[in-house]
Amino acid sequence: DAGYARKVIGPLVETIHIATLGTAATVVVAFPVAFLAARNTTFNSFTWFIGRFILVASRSVNTVVWGLLFVAVFGPGPMAGIWAITFRSVGFLGKLVAEAIEEIDAGVVEAIEATGASRLQVLWIGILPQVLPVIYGTTVYRWDINIRESSVLGFVGAGGIGIVLYAAINQFRWQEVTVILIAVFGVVILSEFISAAVRRRIT
């Protein structure tokens, strides 16, 4: 049904927005947490523990459960979905970036510190350039995952195509379910191609 297919476009675009904004917010949150969780950049053992705790807590809770929690906080809608994606993704992105920070060339950092550079300058000149490829690659890969995860967040009221899919299933409108699933499948395949192409360029 071409008419119904057009109605699916709006929720599908909302799903992409949820995944994209959630991933963008993840980068903002995960980057400082990764520096706390990396042994060679954290301030002390307490801040290292806090950083690691945040990363583990984020990964321990499923995206749908985060969705339920944020629907309770913000009410049904895409805002809950964005925060659910963000809180789930912080652990994934932060862990990989923290590991990359721990594996940087310490000689570069020591050389910059020897010039009397501030901590912020060491971070900006000595550490960030070494981990940027990991940040770019991991962010794009996580965005690809988030496209899929945001497709089901509507089942708990957190916005996107999942709300429409849930309603169609509940009312046994199987033709509409088929149209939605085909649309979701197409977006997932497209995001996979985009993710793979970007990661190839980075590496």
Feature map (PLM): residue ranges:
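Membrane-embedded alpha-helices of multi-pass transport/permease systems
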Residues: 28-33, 65, 80-83, 87-109, ...
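Short helix-to-coil transition segments within interhelical loops
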Residues: 104-121, 125-131, 158
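Generic hydrophobic transmembrane alpha-helix motif, especially the helices
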Residues: 55-86
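Periplasmic/extracellular loop-to-transmembrane helix junction in inner-membrane transport proteins
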Residues: 1-22
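Cytoplasmic-entry segments and transmembrane alpha-helices of multi-pass inner-membrane transporters
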Residues: 33-67, 96-99
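Glycine-rich helix-loop "coupling/hinge" segments at transmembrane-helix boundaries
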Residues: 72, 147-184, 203
